Each structure stands twice: as structure tokens, then as C-alpha cells.
């Protein structure tokens, strides 16, 4: 017996198996058989997967020929489960003779195929595209496609103008028809012939007054923006993956939250207690949603005990925080009473009757003390300050004028001296102003022409 299988084992496993074989040599053959069995099983699994590969199954399907085609819409934009332009075709299987729904390429190759349409398709409908009147969606939900290649819903974007032209070209509708609802009616009839139904809650001209109204609103699912469609029997949110689809009968209850002046949130709660919240819905849409909820008899749990308890807990937590802040303020006030009393002035009362007559530092810039008797005390103080300032200014002006007069007298005296006149600076009549100029008396001889009253005094 060769040891080749041991060499193919991982190092750790090889060491363990070798230890067992050395202790019990007869176990070697058992390990060999086990290895070969596992190897054969793995090869069989690979072959089965290769045979059942979805891509191989779709590739093995024959292209859809015109003789087997029931109905076809060319060049429609597929948004889900793949993104490309393809043809939507209802056709007959050449082998089983049963109707199929396929998305085919320009050569007729089937890229997605759904069989057993009456059992496999659970829901199909036409939906409007918000803010695009000439575009509409075709939405088809199914259990599985051929080969289980895709399971996500089929979402197709269709241009109304293009469909009208195609239908007129192949003679499906009269050339003079411009009403797009005629195209929808024709598509719905072809769906019924192949085993499934397509609802038309938005485009049909005939609406049952007793039926649940259909509408759509804009909202967010987390960070994803989308459209929430409320249909008679379903609720859809799309169309960014994953697309959400609910049956109305599966919605146990609904709650409204985060209500503001402009928006609010809606949470759908299913019967298995799953919650799906949609946010940022416009306030103007509330009445529509509320009417839908009441007509579908969905419970509104916005005021449930659970939510009340959550709200109460939030309020209690907020109250506790406020109480803690108040307690901290009270403690600070008590500390101020103990350590910050000024001249035994009570700080716990602002009542003027308890204040009595007291003097405190003035808030004025000069720091003067005033009596706080009435509201006119400050005005009187300001008037007194202004009068004091005016008196000071008058004194300074008088002093300046006096000095100026003295200066003029000095200047006049000097001029007299230059002209030979004598000035007595020791004269007490000059307000005690005395200046020693260092000038000696000089005798002057009297001429005969000099007369009295000349203005010169002689000693």
C-alpha cells in the first residue's frame, strides 16, 4: 500500500495519522479507503454543480424564435436583477409547450427565464415613476428563475411613447390611438393568457370606490432614498437594492415617530415582529397613510405602552439631569452663604424691606459713596459731579488769566526799561510778585529841557 495519500494531507493532519498508523499498522488501509472516498465524493459534487450551473442552463436554452413568441416589447431598460437593455418576451417552450417569461438579448438568447408562471409569479404590477410622466415601471416578483440564477424581482423601465409606436407598428392598436392605457390593457390580457395577472392601481380609468386607494410617497430607508408605494394588497419600497415587498396582510401594526413640522417617520411591524423604519416622509402625506392604515385595519401602535415607557424613561432621565443641576446650584448657594457674606449682608433675600439702610461701594467710576434711598440719588450725584468739574474748570481758567496778566505786566516793564523808564518790581501792589533782574540804579543828569510829568522819576 503506497503512502502517497499521506503526502497530500496537511502537515498537522499527516503527523496525527502517521502516529496512529505506527501505533496500529492495520489502520493504514482504513485511512486509505477514507481518503479515496472523500476524493470521489468531491469530484461528483463538482460534476453536479457543473451540470446544474445557471449560466450553462440559460446558455443551453434555445433562442426564442418568432414562431413561439406570444408578445414582445423590445429595448426596455432592465434595472433588476441585471442592468442592461433587453427584450421582454412572453413565449411558448418548444419542449414543454408551456408559457415562459424571458428577458432576451438582440439575438434571442435567454438571459433570465421564469417558468410555471401561474405558480412562480407572486405579484406583478405597473407603477408610476415620480416626477416622470412619460416613464413607468413594470414590477414582477417571482419565487425563482430557471436554474435559480436570479431571485431578485424584475424591475423594468418602459417609455410610454416608444410602446405606443411599437404597438402601432405591429398592428396591436389602431394608428389613431394616443391613449397609453390601451397598451396597458393589452399587456394585462396577454399576462392573463399565460397564467398570471398584472395589477394596474394607478393607470386604470376605472377605480372601485370601495377599494383601498393607491399612492406613493418619498422617504428614506437608512441612508438610501427611495419611493414607498402603498398598493391595495402590497407595500413596496424601492428601487435601490434590496427592494422591499410586503403583503398588506402581513403588516401587524404601524407607528409614527420623529414627528416635526415638516417630516415624520413610519415604522412597519410585521407579524413575525420584524421592524422596517422609513424616515423623512413629508407631513402632507400623513393623511393618506393614516387613511390607508385604517382601511387595511392595521393597528396604530404609536401610543402603545412600550413606546410610552420609552418616552417616560427619556423624560425621567431628563428630569434626573435637571434635578442634579438644581442640586449643584443649591450647594453652590449654601457655600456662598457660609463664605461670601459681606458686612453680614444676607444673600438669601432680595427684599428691600429686609435690607434696611446700608451703604455699599458705588458702581460709579470715582468710587464715591452714595445712599441708596431712591432712584433719584444717582441723578443728584451726577449733577454734583458736573458742578464740581465746572468749578474746577473755572478756577483753572482764572488762574490762567491771572498768570497771563502777570506775564503782560512783565513784558510791559521790560519795554519801559528799554525806553529808560524805571519799574519797581518790589511794589507790594503787584500781588507779591517780585523779580530780581540784577539791574543797578544809574544816576541820570537833569537837563533844563526836562519837565515834570515826563513819566520818569528821579531819586
UniProtKB/Swiss-Prot annotation:
SUPFAM superfamilies: PH domain-like (SSF50729). It is found in: Nucleus; Chromosome. GO terms for molecular function: DNA binding; histone binding; nucleosome binding. One of its GO terms (cellular component) is nucleus. The keyword DNA-binding applies. Residues 347-398 have a biased composition (Acidic residues). Keywords: Chaperone, Chromosome, DNA-binding, Nucleus, Transcription, Transcription regulation. Its main location: nucleus. Residues 399-421 have a biased composition (Basic and acidic residues). Histones H3 and H4 chaperone involved in the nucleosome formation and heterochromatin silencing. Required for the deposition of H3K56ac-carrying H3-H4 complex onto newly-replicated DNA. Plays a role in the transcriptional regulation of the cell-cycle dependent histone genes by creating a repressive structure at the core histone gene promoter. Interacts with histones H3 and H4. PANTHER family: FACT COMPLEX SUBUNIT SSRP1, HISTONE CHAPERONE RTT106. This is Histone chaperone RTT106. It comes from Vanderwaltozyma polyspora (strain ATCC 22028 / DSM 70294 / BCRC 21397 / CBS 2163 / NBRC 10782 / NRRL Y-8283 / UCD 57-17).
Amino acid at each position: 500500500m503506497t503512502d502517497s495519500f499521506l503526502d497530500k494531507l496537511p502537515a498537522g493532519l499527516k503527523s496525527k495519522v502517521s502516529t496512529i498508523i505506527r501505533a496500529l499498522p492495520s489502520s493504514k488501509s482504513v485511512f486509505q479507503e477514507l481518503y479515496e472516498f472523500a476524493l470521489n465524493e468531491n469530484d461528483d459534487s463538482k460534476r453536479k454543480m457543473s451540470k446544474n450551473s445557471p449560466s450553462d442552463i440559460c446558455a443551453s436554452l434555445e433562442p426564442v424564435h418568432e414562431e413561439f413568441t406570444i408578445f414582445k416589447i423590445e429595448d426596455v431598460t432592465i434595472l433588476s436583477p441585471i442592468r442592461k437593455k433587453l427584450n421582454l418576451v412572453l413565449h411558448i417552450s418548444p419542449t414543454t409547450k408551456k408559457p415562459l417569461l424571458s428577458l432576451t438579448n438582440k439575438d434571442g438568447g435567454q438571459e433570465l427565464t421564469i417558468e410555471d408562471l401561474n405558480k412562480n409569479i407572486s405579484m406583478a404590477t405597473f407603477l408610476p415613476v415620480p416626477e416622470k410622466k412619460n416613464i413607468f415601471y413594470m414590477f414582477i416578483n417571482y419565487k425563482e428563475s430557471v436554474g435559480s440564477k436570479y431571485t431578485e424581482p424584475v424591475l423594468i423601465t418602459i417609455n410610454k411613447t416608444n410602446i405606443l409606436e411599437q404597438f402601432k407598428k405591429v398592428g396591436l392598436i389602431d394608428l389613431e390611438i394616443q391613449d397609453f392605457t390601451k397598451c396597458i390593457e393589452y399587456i394585462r390580457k396577454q399576462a392573463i393568457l399565460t397564467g398570471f395577472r398584472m395589477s394596474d392601481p394607478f393607470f386604470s380609468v376605472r377605480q372601485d370606490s370601495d377599494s383601498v386607494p393607491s399612492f406613493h410617497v418619498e422617504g428614506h430607508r437608512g441612508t438610501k432614498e427611495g419611493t414607498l408605494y402603498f398598493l391595495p394588497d402590497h407595500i413596496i419600497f424601492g428601487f435601490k437594492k434590496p427592494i422591499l415587498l410586503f403583503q398588506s396582510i402581513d403588516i401587524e401594526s404601524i407607528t409614527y415617530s420623529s414627528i416635526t413640522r415638516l417630516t415624520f417617520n413610519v415604522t412597519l411591524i410585521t407579524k413575525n415582529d420584524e421592524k422596517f423604519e422609513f424616515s423623512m416622509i413629508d407631513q402632507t402625506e400623513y393623511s393618506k397613510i393614516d387613511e390607508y392604515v385604517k382601511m387595511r385595519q392595521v393597528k396604530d401602535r404609536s401610543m402603545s405602552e412600550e413606546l410610552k415607557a420609552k418616552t417616560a424613561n427619556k423624560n425621567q432621565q431628563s428630569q434626573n439631569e435637571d434635578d442634579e443641576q438644581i442640586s449643584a446650584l443649591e450647594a453652590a448657594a449654601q457655600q456662598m452663604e457660609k463664605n461670601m457674606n459681606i458686612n453680614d449682608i444676607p444673600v438669601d433675600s432680595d427684599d428691600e424691606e429686609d435690607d434696611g439702610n446700608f451703604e455699599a461701594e458705588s458702581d460709579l467710576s470715582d468710587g464715591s459713596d452714595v445712599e441708596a434711598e431712591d432712584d433719584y440719588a444717582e441723578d443728584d450725584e451726577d449733577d454734583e459731579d458736573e458742578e464740581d468739574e465746572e468749578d474746577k474748570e473755572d478756577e483753572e481758567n482764572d488762574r490762567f488769566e491771572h498768570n497771563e496778566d502777570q506775564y503782560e505786566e512783565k513784558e510791559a516793564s521790560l519795554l519801559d526799561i528799554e525806553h529808560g523808564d524805571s519799574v519797581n518790581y518790589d511794589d507790594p501792589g503787584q500781588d507779591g510778585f517780585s523779580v530780581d533782574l540784577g539791574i543797578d540804579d544809574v544816576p541820570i543828569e537833569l537837563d533844563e529841557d526836562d519837565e515834570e510829568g515826563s513819566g520818569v522819576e528821579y531819586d
